[in-house]
């Protein structure tokens, strides 16, 4: 058993060791983007308890799906990204569909981070938006360029700092004398369904699982621990921020972005702290999403060794340039199309991991030290597909319905 797991065939993607801390940091960094600052506004109608319920449900089933991918990766000798795993265990169509979903999700996220960072640095430093975006993008690209280990190290430091900043501002919110938890603790089930859709799309770290499996092949039993711990920390952070904001403002006065609410309630220091947190959140997510997309490109197009300079230049150009161009080319309709594709990708990421796991158990290369437990039962797999599909259908109906006048 142990010998089989140690026998790895390296292809274009090389084995790079990650520690448990680094793997957890990558998951938290990927999930906690600047979108966390809008959750209070999204949950204002339904109430915080319903948000927590949906975050728990979405987080649980997303974690199950991630563990399916983890076992599939550990059953494969050669380190592969999602397209390679899908091609091996589902077929070429599955590989193409999952690559499209990865690209749509990654580009959509990086467009948001590029524009968002430009706006924040414009506010903080007085730079033009494009210059702020460039100042943000350069260090992001450098970390992605140096690969998985560099990403893990920087995620560890930056995610830790991000959590500390968030902890300071949340604690200050409750100690300010202006917070009243009863303002957040209400429930209106009429608005529950839209919030479920929002909760599901808060978790985007699924795409990073093959990278984590590649980095933890030397300690396969720690891979599920990293995934579960990373997702748990993510869920706590996603729940605590809206609670703090709604406790300060109430549903009637909550702002679309939490930075404004904190600034109005706590003062300028909170506004700046929240903006710095938002920059950190966007940066950690950019590293995880960008690094994942880069290796997906290498895997999908079967490029030469990922460490080959020419290969890396091509892959990083394909990863970095489209988001920056889209962010400042005024192609709003195209960005909207990417958002739709990302929704479609959510459905693909609910179905393909199920097929992947079931086929990997039949024709995988090796028997791994760790396997999924009861949560790989067909009934649970069916629930994952149904929940993700319903969320996507609701999203489509919401944005195709005519707006009320």
Residue ranges and their predicted role:
Residues 7-14, 129-135, 139, 147-149, ...:
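Helix-loop-helix junctions that connect adjacent transmembrane segments
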Residues 6, 10, 84-87, 114-135, ...:
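Helix-loop-helix connectors at the membrane interface of multi-pass transporters/channels
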Residues 1-41, 46, 63-67, 79, ...:
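Membrane-interface "cap" regions at the ends of multi-pass membrane proteins
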Residues 40-71, 78-79, 83, 233:
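Extracellular loop-to-transmembrane helix junctions
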Residues 64-127, 271, 275-302:
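Hydrophobic transmembrane alpha-helices that form the core helical bundles
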Residues 399-405:
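Conserved small/polar residues in nucleotide/adenosyl-binding loops
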Residues 80-94, 231-283, 342:
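TM-loop-TM module centered on a large, flexible mid-protein loop between adjacent transmembrane helices
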């Amino acid at each position: 058993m142990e010998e089989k797991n140690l026998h790895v065939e390296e292809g274009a993607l090389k084995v790079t060791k990650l520690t448990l801390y680094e793997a957890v940091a990558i998951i938290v960094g990927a999930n906690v983007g600047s979108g966390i600052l809008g959750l209070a506004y999204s949950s204002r109608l339904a109430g915080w308890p319903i948000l927590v319920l949906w975050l728990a449900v979405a987080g649980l089933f997303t974690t199950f799906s991630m563990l399916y991918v983890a076992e599939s990766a550990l059953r494969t000798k050669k380190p592969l990204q999602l397209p390679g795993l899908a091609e091996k265990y589902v077929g070429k169509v599955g590989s193409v569909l999952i690559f499209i979903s990865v690209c749509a999700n990654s580009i959509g996220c990086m467009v948001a981070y590029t524009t968002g960072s430009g706006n924040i640095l414009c506010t903080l430093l007085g730079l033009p938006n494009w210059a702020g975006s460039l100042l943000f993008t350069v260090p992001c690209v450098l970390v992605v360029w140096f690969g998985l280990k560099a990403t893990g190290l920087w995620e560890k430091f930056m995610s830790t700092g991000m959590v500390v900043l968030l902890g300071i501002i949340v604690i200050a919110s409750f100690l300010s004398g202006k917070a009243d938890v009863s303002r957040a603790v209400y429930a209106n089930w009429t608005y529950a369904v839209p919030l479920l859709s929002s909760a599901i799309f808060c978790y985007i770290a699924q795409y990073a699982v093959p990278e984590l499996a590649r980095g933890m092949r030397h300690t396969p039993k720690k891979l599920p621990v990293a995934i579960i711990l990373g997702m748990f920390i993510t869920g706590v952070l996603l729940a605590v921020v809206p609670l703090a904001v709604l406790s300060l403002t109430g549903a009637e006065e909550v702002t679309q972005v939490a930075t404004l609410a904190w600034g109005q309630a706590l003062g300028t220091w909170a506004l700046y702290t929240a903006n710095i947190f938002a920059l950190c959140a966007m940066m950690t997510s950019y590293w995880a999403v960008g690094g994942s997309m880069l290796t997906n490109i290498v895997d999908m197009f079967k490029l030469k060794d990922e460490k080959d300079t020419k290969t890396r230049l091509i892959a990083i150009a394909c990863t970095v340039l489209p988001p920056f161009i889209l962010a400042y080319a005024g192609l709003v309709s195209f960005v909207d199309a990417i958002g739709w594709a990302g929704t479609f990708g959510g459905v693909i990421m609910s179905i393909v991991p199920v097929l992947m796991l079931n086929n990997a158990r039949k024709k995988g290369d090796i028997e791994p030290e760790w396997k999924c437990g009861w949560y790989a039962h067909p009934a649970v797999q069916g629930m994952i597909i149904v929940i993700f599909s319903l969320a996507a259908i609701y999203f489509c109906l919401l944005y195709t319905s005519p707006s009320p006048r």
